[in-house]
Amino acid sequence: MGSVWGLAVPLLVFCWKVGVSVSSPGLDISRSVPLVTTNNMEVSTFTQRDRPSSERAFQTTNLIQYVPLDTQTLSTESASNALSATSISSEVNSRDTQTTSFVTKTRKTHTTTPAASSLEAQTTSPNLSTLNIQITSPIASSLDAQTIFPVSLSLSTQTTSPAPSFLDTQTTSPEPSSLTTSPAPSSLITSPTPSSLTTSPAPSFLDTQTTSPAPSSLTTSPAPSSLDTQTISPIELTLKTQTISTVTETRTVSIRIPSDLTVMHTIPTETLAPSNSPRTGMSTVQTGTVWDSIEAVFDTLCTDDSSEEARKITVDLLTLAHTSTEVEYLSSESSSSSDSSAGVLSSSRVLGPDSATPAKGLVAFNITHIKLSNCITEIETTITISGAPGASLSPTEATAALFTSEILTLPPPTEAKPIFPETTSLSGILSTAGTPALATTLEGTVSTSAITESETAVAQTLTSVGTSVTVRRNPLENTSTLSIETQSHTEVLGTITVPMVAGSTMGEAASFVSFTALDSSSLSVVVTTESSATSETLTTGNTTNSSFLTESHPPFSIYSTTASTSKNPNITLTKTTASPKPPTHPTTSASTAWIRKTTKHDPGEDGGFLLVRLTVASPKDLTEHNAREKLMNQLRRELHARMPLVHMSFLSIRRG
């Protein structure tokens, strides 16, 4: 006990001297707190206010100078039993109040430092941030590192270092560099830990703090490892996917091929009512697409290399169809279509309530050249309607040449009853001539609400005899589309002439429709292909344009123009814009139509077919063996001139 009192009394005197040397007139309030020693004896100490930061710095310097004096007064035995105490701020939000209490209230307690002056240095922190500076180490570098440490628990471990040598090792630790890079320095100010430290002055708790584990356990604080984990952030690698882009390869071809196209036509005729009012009537002659069965032609048509993908590119040509609307009341006996499953609509009717002798007409056409580019086809056809001998044509007959158009494409062979998409383009001149307007839908149906029952009777009185011829080809490969335009022309000689005389008085023109006179009038059909990924609609002065898109067929557009010519059957091909006013005395008119589509149709394994309907002047041309053979031979010669491997079959003959 005597040795303890011998150490305690000089310590109190020294503390009193230091307090007097650094005190100021503004320091007044003090209170006593217990000082806990190893034998549970209490000694009163003082609490006083601190001066500004300049005086506090001076105080710290003085304390460091007194360290050797206090160290010499302490023996080796008393150093191990020294007091365990650290200083904490009594108020978190106060900048001036400091306590000189020797009570230790930390989560980890250790032995006290042997230097009493270091205890005084710990009591001079004005606020929470300076408290951390004063309690850690007398070296400024380590103090700065501790002020920005985000974990309050690690600060308490720094304050309880057992020896000055251990404090020096803390200042040379490599963790301060990571502590300075911590992103949360503000957490020290808002940490509730200092308040909990100031509210535990119980001596009994201090006794338990003196029995804390060895200082080596203090150096194993997990706080630096947590700081290292905070610096780890995920790395996003999404920029690589954004740099991926597709490249489209285009190919160009330029070849010359034979023609493989025929055209569908509609022959508008004029019916005169008893009141001499013009009525428009229509009869149809339809053909399909004639396909070339040679596979090499299709391989070289739309590609310039021998790759496997390029071999699948073929051509699917459109067929230009001109026909009148089909009337639902026509029975299968009166209909001239030989095969209902083929989906070809063909009829003859008169759009007038009164029956009269219609005029006669002759259709002649010829394929001149085909322009192909990247599997996209554009067809230009010219139709000539020549006046028959002994028939007087009215002025409105030429306007009837502006006809209603239908597009016919080859359906896939898997369909039992294929449906052909249609688009209707009706000229404005026909509307002024008394023809009802026709409605167009995506399915190709046309409104016939303007047809009356009296018209039905007239249509049933018309008689016609038809013959159907089917042309089959070899299967094609899958189709494709390229993007760069290249044009190629091929001149095709020869003429496919289809005669047709409309009306019930066909016998008068029997001699005129003989096959020997078929070449007297012919016009050219121009087939053009251009590269285009989408459909294009072309517009002229008095035409009505229409285009549509379905799932099973590519998009296309169609428009019509008209041109007036003389009565001479040898008509030159002339493209002019149709005038809204009909000519004064026309005897022959020509109509030109274009179609453009992207060829993506796959005809399938069974190949395509061509359904040809021929209306002749006399039933003897079909019933008599010689006349029928003559007709078939002529068709065979014309088709074989373009496609050597075409197969022809005579389907049926129907009588109206």
UniProtKB/Swiss-Prot annotation:
UniProt keyword terms in alphabetical order: Cell membrane, Cell projection, Glycoprotein, Membrane, Repeat, Secreted, Signal
Any one cellular-component term (Gene Ontology): cytosol
Stretch list, region Disordered: 85-125, 159-232, 329-348, 560-592
Region of interest (Approximate repeats), ranges: 180-227
InterPro entries given in the database record: MUC20
PANTHER family per record: MUCIN-20
Signal peptide: 1-21
Domain of life: Eukaryota
Protein name: Mucin-20
Residue ranges, annotated region (Involved in oligomerization): 399-603
Start-end of Polar residues biased regions: 85-96, 114-125, 159-170, 560-573
Glycosylation sites: 366, 570
Ranges of biased composition (kind: Low complexity): 171-227
UniProt subunit comment: Interacts with MET; oligomerization increases affinity for MET.
Tissue specificity: Highly expressed in kidney. Up-regulated in renal tissues during renal injury.
Sequence repeat copies, ranges: 180-188, 189-197, 198-206, 210-218, 219-227
TM segment ranges: none
Compartment(s) where it occurs, according to its Swiss-Prot or TrEMBL record: Secreted; Apical cell membrane; Basolateral cell membrane; Cell projection, Microvillus membrane
GO molecular function, one term: identical protein binding
Function, as annotated: May regulate MET signaling cascade. Seems to decrease hepatocyte growth factor (HGF)-induced transient MAPK activation. Blocks GRB2 recruitment to MET thus suppressing the GRB2-RAS pathway. Inhibits HGF-induced proliferation of MMP1 and MMP9 expression.
Residues covered by region (Interaction with MET): 604-656
GO terms under biological process: hepatocyte growth factor receptor signaling pathway; positive regulation of apoptotic process; positive regulation of MAPK cascade
